[in-house]
Amino acid sequence: MSKVKTRVYCCGGTGMDIGVNLQWHPDLVFIDTCDKNVTADHDLERVFLTEGTRGAGKNRRYMLPIIRPQVPGFLERYPAGDFNIVVFGLGGGSGSTIGPVIVSELAKAGESVAVVCMSGIEATEVLQNDIDTLKTLEGIAAATNTPVVINHIENVNGVPYTELDKEAIFNIHALINLTSQKHVRLDKLDIDNWINFTKKHNQIQPQLCQLHISNNRQEATSVPEPIAIASLFADASREVAFGTPFVRTVGISDVSDPDLLADQLHFVINSIGVASLFGSLTKQKQELEAAQVRYQQRNAIIDIDDNRTDDGFVV
């Protein structure tokens, strides 16, 4: 059986929330550790719940050995596509383990894959998960000798998750469009060599990289030290080369395509931006810890004169 063109794997609570808005794509599926993120809007035929789990409680260390052996069966049920998008949150306990395990399995199998992920900033344990998940993705890149490319949705205090989800939905839609194999001049190997740029340029160290998606050439041009660029143009006469990438590929879209999101789209991969992302999350965690260290431990309201039983009752 031939592969689907673009498979989308939506993992954990973040993946469930984002993916429910993209079910128009026939090759999108969900995986989570409990049913608490499943709503009436989810197509249950696409939902895979891991066995022996009732959520993760943001505990990645607890969850990893439970879900790791279940992912191969999930991938057998929903095989990889020519291109694969893995969607998850960095800061939880389910998606941040399921997602990287899927990425690792796909990378080991030589599949093309990109990640769309969102950080969490609401607690120190969440920020620590963000940090550890990024480190995990860097580790997967080193272990598989393949770059791991993430489109990161930045979580900002005061911005509702619904707004962040909109950015993720647009970016996933854009990636589905890019990898649809329906653009003039853009074939499957062009996409493979763009996302797996170290195949042809082995002087570049495989590591965690960041994918910047924009419908504005000026904005795309501002991405520092671009390694690989893919662009879509609805009007071939507007094609303009920019940046200093190792890899550049271009597709010309059909203006009548209902999936046309903009007259141009640019997908720029670099690695230098990961350092600032990692630094920002680390700084936010340190700021929370600095505030928490000033918390006061109150004195106990029980004292030695209370008539207290061995099991804690005061009578």
Swiss-Prot record:
GO terms for molecular function: GTP binding; GTPase activity. InterPro entries: PhuZ_C, Tubulin/FtsZ_GTPase_sf. Keywords: GTP-binding, Host cytoplasm, Hydrolase, Nucleotide-binding. Belongs to the FtsZ family. PhuZ subfamily. Gene3D superfamilies: Tubulin/FtsZ, GTPase domain. It is found in: Host cytoplasm. This is Phage tubulin-like protein. The non-hydrolyzable GTP analog GMPCPP stabilizes filaments, which never disassemble. Pfam families: TubZ_C_2. The gene is 028. It comes from the Viruses. Its main location: host cell. Homomultimer. Polymerizes in a strictly GTP-dependent manner. It comes from Pseudomonas phage PhiPA3. Its EC number is 3.6.5.-. GO terms for cellular component: host cell cytoplasm. It catalyses: GTP + H2O = GDP + phosphate + H(+). Consists of two domains: a nucleotide-binding N-terminus that hydrolyzes GTP and a C-terminus domain necessary for polymerization. The domains are bridged by a long, central helix. Interactions between the C-terminus and the following monomer drive polymerization. A tubulin-like GTPase that forms filaments, which are required for positioning viral DNA and capsids in the middle of the host cell for optimal replication. The motor component of a partition system which pushes phage DNA (encased by protein gp105) to the center of the bacterial host cell. Also required for movement of phage capsids to the vicinity of the DNA and rotation of the encased viral DNA at midcell. Forms filaments during the lytic phase, which position phage DNA at the center of the bacterial host cell. The record marks 187, 190 as: GTP hydrolysis. GTP binds at residues 13-14, 93-95.
